[in-house]
């Protein structure tokens, strides 16, 4: 089983994915938790580049760094895990490229789809959980997290984008989910971590 978690910065993806990992592991599933960028050795190097607030990356450079990370990540981690019958939970995946670079940066979504297909070799998740939350609340969460962990410089580039960018990302995720209703389920993330976890389990029980 391959499940991805998507959403804007500060939507609660990491907390949820850790809860889901614990839950499905306790039910006897062989679970792998991974993320993009940074789910493989190359990805760890690329993550420091693409998320740093100190580098003036162009939109095109940003895109191809994400795609390079994804191609290596799929080949090294996701595809082997799926072939070995493991349950894979991934924090961000190909949908993030469609939304951030397409709806956010204004790139051609058709082209982004084609680039993604090369990187992922046709491996799409069985289910994607989209965590939807008010932009201001989510950014407040993200900024508090980054401040507490000392990540403002090394991983704060997207959080420092203007509010209009984040609104485009939220709207883009919702629009993209509407175009892929069978795979993407929208969850209300403006709630407690426990409620969000219960929402997620209810959805995933239908495909396990």
UniProtKB/Swiss-Prot annotation:
Which GO terms fall under biological process for this protein? dTDP biosynthetic process; dTTP biosynthetic process; dUDP biosynthetic process
Species: Lawsonia intracellularis (strain PHE/MN1-00)
Q: Which reaction does it catalyse?
A: dTMP + ATP = dTDP + ADP
Q: Which molecular function terms from Gene Ontology are attached?
A: ATP binding; dTMP kinase activity
Which lineage? Bacteria, Pseudomonadati, Thermodesulfobacteriota, Desulfovibrionia, Desulfovibrionales
Q: What is the main EC category here?
A: transferase
Its keywords, alphabetically, are: ATP-binding, Kinase, Nucleotide biosynthesis, Nucleotide-binding, Transferase
- Function noted in UniProt: Phosphorylation of dTMP to form dTDP in both de novo and salvage pathways of dTTP synthesis.
Per the record, its GO cellular-component terms are: cytosol
Q: Which SUPFAM superfamilies match?
A: P-loop containing nucleoside triphosphate hydrolases (SSF52540)
Please give the InterPro entries that the UniProt record associates with this protein.
P-loop_NTPase (IPR027417), Thymidylate_kin-like_dom (IPR039430), Thymidylate_kinase (IPR018094)
This chain's protein is named: Thymidylate kinase
What is this enzyme's EC? Answer: 2.7.4.9
Amino-acid positions noted as binding ATP in the UniProt annotation, renumbered to this chain? 7-14
User: What family does this chain come from, according to its entry?
Assistant: Belongs to the thymidylate kinase family.
């Amino acid at each position: 089983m391959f499940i991805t978690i998507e959403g804007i910065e500060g939507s609660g993806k990491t907390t949820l994915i850790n809860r889901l990992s614990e839950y499905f592991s306790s039910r006897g599933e062989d679970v792998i938790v991974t993320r993009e960028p940074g789910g493989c050795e190359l990805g760890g190097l690329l993550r420091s580049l693409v998320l740093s607030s100190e580098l003036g990356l162009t939109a095109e450079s940003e895109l191809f760094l994400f795609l390079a990370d994804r191609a290596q990540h799929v080949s090294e981690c996701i595809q082997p895990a799926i072939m070995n019958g493991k349950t894979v939970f991934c924090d961000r995946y190909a949908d993030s490229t469609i939304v951030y670079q397409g709806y956010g940066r204004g790139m051609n979504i058709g082209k982004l789809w084609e680039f993604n297909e090369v990187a992922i070799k046709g491996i799409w998740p069985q289910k994607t959980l989209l965590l939807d939350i008010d932009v201001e609340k989510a950014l407040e969460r993200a900024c508090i997290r980054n401040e507490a962990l000392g990540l403002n410089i090394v991983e704060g580039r997207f959080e420092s984008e203007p509010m209009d960018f984040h609104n485009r990302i939220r709207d883009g995720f919702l629009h993209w989910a509407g175009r892929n209703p069978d795979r993407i389920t929208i969850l209300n993330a403006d709630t407690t971590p426990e409620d969000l976890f219960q929402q997620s389990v209810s959805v995933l029980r239908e495909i396990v």
